[in-house]
Amino acid sequence: MNHAPHLYFAWQQLVDKSQLMLRLATEEQWDELIASEMAYVNAVQEIAHLTEEVAPSTTMQEQLRPMLRLILDNESKVKQLLQIRMDELAKLVGQSSVQKSVLSAYGDQGGFVLAPQDNLF
């Protein structure tokens, strides 16, 4: 049985999923990116299964090489965008922690909560 057309189609689907994930990361659609990750992992597993059954010919490997490069480039870009997002989130968590510490230390003075008033006079 010739698996070449099915293998090529599986790789094309992986390219499509990879491009979708890059677009979602670029557009900062983080929830959608996470939701699409399982389909990407499943596509990778399908390719692994197909290549375990029958190793692709040298000709097929040459045809698949540009797809693999594109997938790896997309994955690298997604990782960079995710790192930027993680740094942003770490900064926000740090700011929140500082605010909580300040409120804890200075927010309750003598039983009264300090809050700005509209009219002081």
From Swiss-Prot:
Q: Which InterPro entries match?
A: FliT
Pfam family example for this protein? FliT
Q: Which keywords are on file for this protein?
A: Bacterial flagellum biogenesis, Chaperone, Cytoplasm, Repressor, Transcription, Transcription regulation
Q: Name one GO cellular component term.
A: cytosol
Write out the ranges of the annotated region (FliD binding). 60-98
In terms of superkingdom, the source organism counts as Bacteria
- State the compartments where it is located: Cytoplasm, Cytosol
What residue spans carry the region label Required for homodimerization?
A: 1-50
GO BP, sorted A to Z:
bacterial-type flagellum organization; negative regulation of bacterial-type flagellum assembly; protein folding
Q: Which family does it belong to?
A: Belongs to the FliT family.
Q: So what does this one do?
A: Dual-function protein that regulates the transcription of class 2 flagellar operons and that also acts as an export chaperone for the filament-capping protein FliD. As a transcriptional regulator, acts as an anti-FlhDC factor; it directly binds FlhC, thus inhibiting the binding of the FlhC/FlhD complex to class 2 promoters, resulting in decreased expression of class 2 flagellar operons. As a chaperone, effects FliD transition to the membrane by preventing its premature polymerization, and by directing it to the export apparatus.
Q: Describe, as the record does, how this protein assembles with itself and its partners.
A: Homodimer. Interacts with FliD and FlhC.
Name of the protein described by the UniProt record: Flagellar protein FliT
Q: What is the source species? A: Shigella sonnei (strain Ss046)
- What gene, per UniProt, encodes this protein? fliT
